[in-house]
Amino acid sequence: MATTLISKLTLSSAFLGQQFSSRGNSMRSAPAGLFLRGPRCAATDTPYGGNIPQFPRVNVWDPYKRLGISRDASEEEVWSSRNFLLNQYYNHERSAESIEAAFEKILMASFINRKKTKINLKTRLKKKVEESPPWVQNLLSFVELPPPVIILRRLFLFGFMACWSVMNSTEAGPAFQVAISFGACVYFLNDKTKSLGRAALIGFGALVAGWFCGSLLVPMIPPNLLHPTWSLELLTSLFIYVSLFLGCTFLK
């Protein structure tokens, strides 16, 4: 009886061992992909990488409201708002494009307004000239505005003459420099008016006007503001250079 029970227990344990071993082999032979496979990442199912911040005012039509600024904002405030928003949403392509588009619209509107302001200013000045008295119109007909290059060249010439006179103030008077400046003034006016007599008359008038203003204003300057070697003649010549420059540059 005991022998029979021992044999049954031996057979059952052997059978159970075979079952466990077969299950272990089946688990080892199972494809590795079943164990490597896990839940998909949610970031791959969402556009633009999932957690990238998006600009909340992408669809706002007004460019000022889109950038979060007022219509009276300065150019520095516009640039600052644009840079701040781009630093926050540069990873989101649509947000960055929306911010840049609003910024470009504001710049274009500012350029158009400036252009209109310049045109309106010219129109107003022209209208005021037309509405002015006849003697004012006749006076303005003798005035013109040359290109900036011509203004700078003549300013350099007469500025050089003034510096030359100041540097030689201890040796001799500025008569030679004034004569050269007067000749240059007549030359420029003759090239403009094509009339030597008219050019000489305007140049002489500019010379007299500069001398008169210098003789009248120089004595009013406090002596402690002037260099000891600067004479009345030298200071008067500086006014003459200014008058000759204005005459040959803006008169016709």
Swiss-Prot record:
Q: Record's family? A: Belongs to the chaperone-like protein of POR1 protein family.
> Is Chloroplast found in the keyword set?
yes
Q: Which InterPro entries match?
A: CPP1-like
Q: What is this protein called?
A: Protein CHAPERONE-LIKE PROTEIN OF POR1, chloroplastic
Q: Indicate the transmembrane segments per the record.
A: 156-176, 201-221, 231-251
> Which topology term describes how it sits in the membrane?
Multi-pass membrane protein
Molecular-function GO terms, alphabetical:
protein folding chaperone
Q: A biological process (GO) annotation for this entry?
A: chaperone-mediated protein folding
Q: Which organism is it from?
A: Nicotiana benthamiana
Give the stretch annotated as transit peptide in the record, renumbered to this chain: 1-40
Give any Gene Ontology cellular component. chloroplast envelope
Q: Where in the cell is it found?
A: Plastid, Chloroplast envelope; Plastid, Chloroplast thylakoid membrane
Q: How does it assemble?
A: Interacts with POR1 and POR2 in chloroplast.
Superkingdom assignment: Eukaryota
Q: What does this protein do?
A: Exhibits holdase chaperone activity involved in the stabilization of POR proteins against photooxidative stress in chloroplasts. Required for chloroplast development.
Please provide the record's keywords in A-Z order.
Answer: Chaperone, Chloroplast, Membrane, Plastid, Thylakoid, Transit peptide, Transmembrane, Transmembrane helix
Consequences of knocking out this gene:
Reduced chloroplast biogenesis and chlorophyll synthesis associated with less POR protein accumulation.
Using the UniProt annotation, give all residue ranges assigned to the region (J-like domain required for holdase chaperone activity).
61-116
